[in-house]
């Protein structure tokens, strides 16, 4: 009978498991892996519980799948500053696309535009001085201290030894306080022997 320690040994020992190394090689070509999250695996009488630490990761940035008997948890841990900048850029793009639809001015708007251009020419000299001051006071993001890890993360768990015992239709996932919990119930009849009837 396979113990939990056997499963973890198989996972960590690349030389003894061709499926694991093949999977690792195949997926690491596409993206560089910056973070390998910590994982706890518990096998009880009725279920398999996998807990993965993903502090600071949004649940929308996590991808979970099972391929060739290997559970793959992957995604990206983004800096909060970058997230905010991306959201602002998306909002600006939406606003710009909405403004382009309403680009043609009415007669009143055209007359106001002509007046504003003449006023603008008068104030050009004053604004050039203000622009130079604005350049010096612009906010520049500098990292004073950066100790946290960011980037792509990926973690594998080889389930080939116990996959026949698991009911994959019962997979339940929860993500709370930076902890991803995957629960897979065991089948009622988990024997790997199949009875074949003769016709």
UniProtKB/Swiss-Prot annotation:
PROSITE patterns: SHSP
Region of interest (Disordered), residue spans: 83-105
Keyword Nucleotide-binding set for record: no
Domain sHSP: start-end pairs: 30-199
Glycosyltransferase recorded as keyword: no
InterPro entries in the cross-refs: A-crystallin/Hsp20_dom, HSP20-like_chaperone, HspG1-11-like
Keywords assigned: Stress response
Family, as annotated: Belongs to the small heat shock protein (HSP20) family.
The protein's name in its UniProt record: Small heat shock protein hspG4
Native source organism of the sequence: Dictyostelium discoideum
Gene coding for it: hspG4
């Amino acid at each position: 009978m396979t113990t939990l320690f056997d499963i973890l040994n198989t996972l960590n020992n690349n030389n003894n498991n061709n499926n694991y190394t093949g999977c690792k090689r195949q997926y690491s070509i596409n993206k560089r892996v910056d973070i390998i999250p910590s994982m706890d695996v518990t096998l009880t009488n009725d279920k398999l519980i996998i807990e993965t630490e993903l502090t600071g990761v949004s649940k929308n940035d996590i991808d979970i799948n099972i391929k060739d008997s290997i559970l793959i948890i992957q995604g990206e841990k983004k800096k909060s500053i970058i997230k905010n900048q991306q959201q602002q850029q998306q909002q600006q793009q939406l606003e710009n696309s909405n403004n382009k639809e309403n680009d043609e001015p009415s007669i009143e708007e055209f007359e106001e535009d002509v007046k504003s251009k003449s006023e603008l020419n008068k104030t050009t000299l004053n604004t050039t001085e203000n622009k130079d001051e604005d350049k010096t006071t612009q906010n520049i993001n500098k990292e004073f201290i950066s100790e946290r890890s960011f980037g792509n993360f990926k973690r594998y768990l080889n389930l080939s030894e116990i996959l026949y015992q698991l009911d994959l239709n019962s997979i339940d996932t929860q993500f709370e306080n930076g902890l991803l919990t995957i629960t897979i119930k065991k089948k009622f009849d988990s024997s790997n022997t199949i009875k074949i009837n003769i016709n």
